[in-house]
Amino acid sequence: MNRILLLEDDVSLIDGLVYSLKKNEFDVEVARTVCEAKQYLSELDRYDLLILDVTLPDGTGFDVCERVRKENQQIPIIFLTASDEEVSIIRGLDSGGDDYITKPFKLGELCSRIRALLRRAVYAKREKNTSMECGDITIDLLGS
């Protein structure tokens, strides 16, 4: 089961979104502030995908995204926010986001976008693994 970290401060949205994502077989953990998200992200490898709101009480999802990208270029990041201004969309994508979805949104579309990003992430991991190791022996799978 894929694990998602959701950074969102709107409690009513959190409840419905967590319920729906779990029904779609995603494991979801929630952070309500940037500070709380930083604690979760100290173990970034636990997550397969991040969903970030932009406007939070103690910072922005853009800042979280930029911090994550310094450590991990591969993890898919989706911005899910009410801010539909072009400047916000551009900043989200330029800061390292893979997708930008505005509220209100369709849950089916969000789940499809999540699955698409997770498929690409798995493929990218496979591409990255070009050698095998067993003890002292390393095999170059590409023969280069």
At which residue positions do the language-model features occur?
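N-terminal/domain-start alpha-helical segments
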Residues: 1-123
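Short, Lys/Arg-enriched segments at the junction into DNA-binding effector domains
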Residues: 116-144
